[in-house]
Amino acid sequence: MQKEYKTITEISGPLVFAEVDEPVGYDEMVEIETPSGETRRGQVLESTSEFVAIQVFEGTSGIDRNSSVRFLGETLQMPLTEELLGRVLSGSGEPIDGGPEIEPDEEREIVGAAINPTAREYPEEFIQTGVSAIDGMNTLIRGQKLPIFSGSGLPHNELALQIARQASVPEEESGDDEAGSEFAVIFGAMGITQEEANEFMDDFERTGALERSVVFMNLADDPAVERTVTPRMALTTAEYLAFEEGYHVLVILTDMTNYCEALREIGAAREEVPGRRGYPGYMYTDLAQLYERAGRIEGREGSVTQIPILTMPGDDDTHPIPDLTGYITEGQIYIDRNLNSQGIEPPINVLPSLSRLMDDGIGEGFTREDHPDVSDQAYAAYAEGEDLRDLVNIVGREALSERDNKYLDFADRFEEEFVQQGYDTNRDVEETLDLAWELLSDLPKEELNRIDEEAIEEYYVEDEQAAQTAD
């Protein structure tokens, strides 16, 4: 029998403090009934022999000392079934799409169990996003965690939607008639506005991407406490689809900055000693608990790949949120404000971007045999073009050699033709590599010193006029 308490002593922001006379488990679920008869859900955040701190999912407005508290003896769980695909849920896992109630095959605690390191399979095989700057230069690998670093006002939401629409596992698609049936997307939105939520849903429904997706929506006016639950709900669903149903699951979480702000708000309500810039000292551990749920398990068909998106306050990549994220994850994709102002879509700056696992999932047997060399050469050529732009600002373009001008032209074309593709263009990896070769072929063959000679002979695009002159 559940015991009921009317011992609330304090209410602070999203937290309720109550006295108890018996042990209460950490993370235990709680029901709070207000004097008006309304029931709110909560979770034990801190427990001692004399009192508990409860975080309330629906907010503390209307709760007072006369409210009753019931401890349910279980932790927060996510109802799981393959039928979740195509559904839209609140940040706490409740259906909000007008569809039927979820009839779960099982329920799991949202905290999740760590993958045994000895059972982890090393991430291999690439995921095709259809975005050249990612597929060609910073390839996403199955089981990887690759964040997108953005800034306020930049189009990271548009890029997130493009990836959600286009992402696929090419060999799975070509392996049977049900193209893409083994791929699923979990989209977890935290602290977004109603306008952004409407844009997300319109895009999912218009493009048909919702059929293979599970969407979790936590809005800006929803309680901060729910924001801390949303990514755990999303990842628990991803783990079930990946390791029980055999899907390759891509988890897109936006915006992790809002998640960390919720941690700070709750920490302040608990009067915790703050860490860097007021964020909790345990934020690194908390983020690691989320990001480390990506991966593959030996003997299981599926995989969980993560793309967390975060906006860097003040475009500062030394801010605690991107800084700690960078320590845990395996690279980063940078959204660039200057490229955005030039109208480049998506404005991905490939130079500071990095995919640490890229080399393990590209090349012969994965993408194409020339991919590693082409990527290296394009990086080098674009970097040289960028350096020369700085020089042009000092001495003018007329002072540069013919060779230098070719690299400047390459840098311009690289941004305008390779990075630029719009948010509705889906390029497969063959198109991406062919486009890279077209740009690299503007450089003399002797400049392509990072590419194997056989690949140059096969893919280098000879200038027709030059070829006729040589004949």
UniProtKB/Swiss-Prot annotation:
Membrane-spanning segments: none
SUPFAM superfamilies in the cross-refs: C-terminal domain of alpha and beta subunits of F1 ATP synthase, P-loop containing nucleoside triphosphate hydrolases
Protein name (database record): A-type ATP synthase subunit B
Source species: Natronomonas pharaonis (strain ATCC 35678 / DSM 2160 / CIP 103997 / JCM 8858 / NBRC 14720 / NCIMB 2260 / Gabara)
PROSITE patterns per UniProt: ATPASE_ALPHA_BETA
Lineage of origin: Archaea, Methanobacteriati, Methanobacteriota, Stenosarchaea group, Halobacteria
Membrane topology summary: Peripheral membrane protein
Function noted in UniProt: Component of the A-type ATP synthase that produces ATP from ADP in the presence of a proton gradient across the membrane. The B chain is a regulatory subunit.
GO MF, one annotated term: proton-transporting ATP synthase activity, rotational mechanism
Gene symbol of the encoding locus: atpB
GO process annotations (BP): proton motive force-driven plasma membrane ATP synthesis
First-listed, main subcellular location of the protein, grouped into a coarse class: membrane
Localization: Cell membrane
Keywords tagged on the record: ATP synthesis, Cell membrane, Hydrogen ion transport, Ion transport, Membrane, Transport
CDD domains in alphabetical order: ATP-synt_V_A-type_beta_C (cd18112), ATP-synt_V_A-type_beta_N (cd18118), V_A-ATPase_B (cd01135)
